[in-house]
A protein has these predicted regions:
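Hydrophobic faces of well-ordered beta-strands that scaffold small-molecule active sites
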Residues: 21-26, 46-48, 74-78, 97-99
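Active-site-adjacent beta->alpha loops and helix N-cap segments on the catalytic face
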Residues: 2-12, 52-70, 81-87, 101-103
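Glycine-rich, proline-tolerant flexible connector loops at the mouths of alpha/beta enzymes
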Residues: 34-62
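Short, flexible loop/turn motifs enriched in small residues
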Residues: 31
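Short, surface-exposed connector motifs at secondary-structure boundaries
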Residues: 17-19, 42-46, 67-72, 90-96
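N-terminal amphipathic alpha-helix/helix-capping segment at the start of soluble metabolic enzymes
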Residues: 1-28
Length: 103
């Protein structure tokens, strides 16, 4: 029997369907509780900042899990423009990436 999976909308979908300006919040704390509060606060999107923080893959995964239940669109900023690292973030289930330092 197939297991239904409901993913949050992508950031592009949220932008496309927006009829008014969108408001989002950046998650700059490694706290799952803080991430959960932000995700449940009614923002259009949240961004988990992996560039200007000491987060490893484990912390990113725990923040994604903490915000899963709220259906908010999540963007994750990776620390560097590195193909191998970006693939690891995608393996975690990240749907929307912000990649820094692209020339």
């Amino acid at each position: 029997m197939p297991i239904p999976v409901k993913l949050p909308p992508t950031f592009a979908d949220v932008l496309e369907k927006a009829e008014q300006p969108l408001v989002g919040a950046w998650i700059c704390s490694g706290s799952e509780a803080a991430a959960e509060i932000i995700a449940s606060a009614g923002f259009s999107w949240t961004l988990i900042d992996g560039e200007h923080s000491p987060y490893g893959l484990e912390t990113i995964l725990s923040l994604l899990r903490a915000t899963d239940a709220y259906g908010v669109t999540r963007v994750v900023r990776v620390p560097v423009n590195n193909t191998a690292l970006i693939k690891q973030y995608l393996d975690l289930g990240v749907q929307n990436l912000m990649v820094p330092m692209i020339d």
